[in-house]
Regions:
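Membrane-embedded and interfacial regions of multi-pass energy-transducing membrane proteins
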Residues: 1-27, 31-183
């Protein structure tokens, strides 16, 4: 909590950085939900794109975990009780629940050990997993090709060189588009 207070009160524009971080995370979820809705509308979960959808769902689960762990980091009453409730939900799983909750908390109660554990997961571990899943998601998309609302399979009609005649090459067009989107 002291570090958040320091950033908010003593670092120049620290309050803006913190609020941009939290608001940006919420905005990112809006974009993720729109992306998932588009995938549902286009039927992107159907064959042959099931692997792309699976990677997308795993990305979503990791994003939810990332958001939950970030929610705990201000270490206020809301974040403490939120962590208490969510970790105790894991404790209700039959047979392994108590040990799983103890493993997640790092102690018998939500404490500094939980905060340190969630900080490390929020800043290092989950972003690395997310990066790997995003690379796998894009690689699977590159292999099968993206979907469209018309349901036209662009990879069916290929030229003599094996390049689809009805589509746009992934590189450089989508690569540049994605880089511009990230920036």
């Amino acid at each position: 909590f002291a570090s958040v207070e320091y950033i908010m009160r003593d670092v120049n524009w620290g309050w803006l950085i913190r609020y941009m971080h939290s608001t940006g995370a919420s905005a990112f979820f809006v974009v993720v939900y729109m992306h998932m809705l588009r995938g549902l509308m286009y039927g992107s979960f159907k064959q042959p794109r099931e692997l792309i959808w699976l990677f997308g769902v795993l990305i979503y689960v990791c994003l939810m975990a990332e958001a939950f762990m970030g929610y705990l980091l201000p270490w206020g009453q809301m974040s403490y009780w939120g962590a208490q409730v969510i970790v105790n939900l894991f404790g209700t799983i039959p047979v392994i629940g108590d040990q799983l909750a103890l493993f997640i908390r790092g102690d018998y109660v939500v404490s500094d050990a939980t905060l340190n554990r969630f900080f490390a997961l929020h800043v290092i571990a989950v972003p690395i997993v997310l990066l790997g899943l995003v690379v796998a998601h894009i690689a699977a998309l590159h292999t099968v090709g993206s979907n469209n609302p018309d349901g036209v399979e662009i990879k069916k009609n290929k030229g003599a060189d094996g390049i689809p005649l009805d589509g746009i090459p992934f590189h450089p067009y989508y690569t540049v588009k994605d880089i511009v989107g990230v920036v």
